[in-house]
Amino acid sequence: ETTGLHPGFAFPIHASAAGKILWAYQDEDLLETELKRSHIKFQDKTKVNPDEVRVALKDSLEKGYGIHDEEWDQGVLAIAVPVFLGRKMPVMAVGIVAVKDRVLKKYSIEEIVEKLGKLRDKISPILEEA
């Protein structure tokens, strides 16, 4: 059972898909400052050790997407891809937050990432016009 999705809530960098992919691109000094802060261990899977968070961010950068797999809420999966809008650094992320069992019955993580990439490619020109 999930403890609930939280629309509109600001998710922490160490336990959110969007946070991981956005912070993966950040300047080392800024990242170091953030990693020195205390981070809450929401679930058993939540990484709070700065070295573990760093590994997760590096993994996100290498894969091209951020993922949180029950790190915030039990039974919840989130995946996010960066949106660059012509810049070197992402300005936002687009992603999904879903009940893990339900979404993985229909799609693999790779399929979700592919669909999110297509969505990003479709919305980027619209966002660039704004």
Listing of model-derived features with the role each one plays in the protein:
Residues 35-80, 121, 126:
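Short, basic/aromatic recognition patches
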Residues 83-86:
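Sensor-regulatory modules in signal-transduction proteins
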